[in-house]
């Protein structure tokens, strides 16, 4: 059981990131979405370690935050950011019937470029305003973003029968498949209180804000398109991360 879980986690990391790991024959990539919040926490942990190292070297917070965002893109290979860009291009089309066609086009349009700039600016500026427990904030942001992806998979129809993200529907079929990730994020939210018992309010806000932003972002894209695609899964991740960081600046 433990071996199978570790193999599934390895498959998820290989699928969703550029983290150099040995490839093992026979890995099952059909269920990678089940462990995607855990992958998010791993990504956030790496970003937190990098941020802490740069802080130790005396790097200014703005430069440090910008480098963290650059590393963020590198670790994920821009997978989710590309989806957010394609989604923005599709939503910019007035004709609903042409939106999926535009999203499938690999060429980046003006709205896609603007959405990428907006996401990167929001992440960088928000991180610059967050002074304490940045490692934990990064883990929470990455985790909630990917739990939002699970919400989109579980709760809404997939719009393409043979799309690149269609197989995720076989891994996450119902609301109960969201519970493991939610419990994991509940634990991460509780860490804010454990590291400082005066931060109980922050723990509660992290839990409520993270779950609400993830859920509402997935619902909004479903409202605009009538369902989801692999691109909108990426858009949910990126916008949940960015908006979550923005909300946390209020607490600091």
UniProtKB/Swiss-Prot annotation:
One of its GO terms (cellular component) is plasma membrane. One of its GO terms (molecular function) is cobalamin 5'-phosphate synthase activity. It catalyses: alpha-ribazole + adenosylcob(III)inamide-GDP = adenosylcob(III)alamin + GMP + H(+); alpha-ribazole 5'-phosphate + adenosylcob(III)inamide-GDP = adenosylcob(III)alamin 5'-phosphate + GMP + H(+). Its cofactor is Mg(2+). Pathway: Cofactor biosynthesis; adenosylcobalamin biosynthesis; adenosylcobalamin from cob(II)yrinate a,c-diamide: step 7/7. The chain crosses the membrane at residues 4-24, 39-59, 65-85, 102-122, 135-155, 178-198, 201-221, 232-252. It is a multi-pass membrane protein. Its main location: membrane. It is an enzyme of class 2 (transferase). InterPro entries: CobS. Coiled coil: none annotated. Signal peptide: none annotated. Keywords: Cell inner membrane, Cell membrane, Cobalamin biosynthesis, Magnesium, Membrane, Transferase, Transmembrane, Transmembrane helix. It is found in: Cell inner membrane. It holds the Pfam family CobS. Its EC number is 2.7.8.26. GO terms for biological process: cobalamin biosynthetic process. Joins adenosylcobinamide-GDP and alpha-ribazole to generate adenosylcobalamin (Ado-cobalamin). Also synthesizes adenosylcobalamin 5'-phosphate from adenosylcobinamide-GDP and alpha-ribazole 5'-phosphate. Belongs to the CobS family. NCBIfam families: cobS (TIGR00317). This is Adenosylcobinamide-GDP ribazoletransferase. The lineage of its organism: Bacteria, Bacillati, Cyanobacteriota, Cyanophyceae, Nostocales. The gene is cobS.
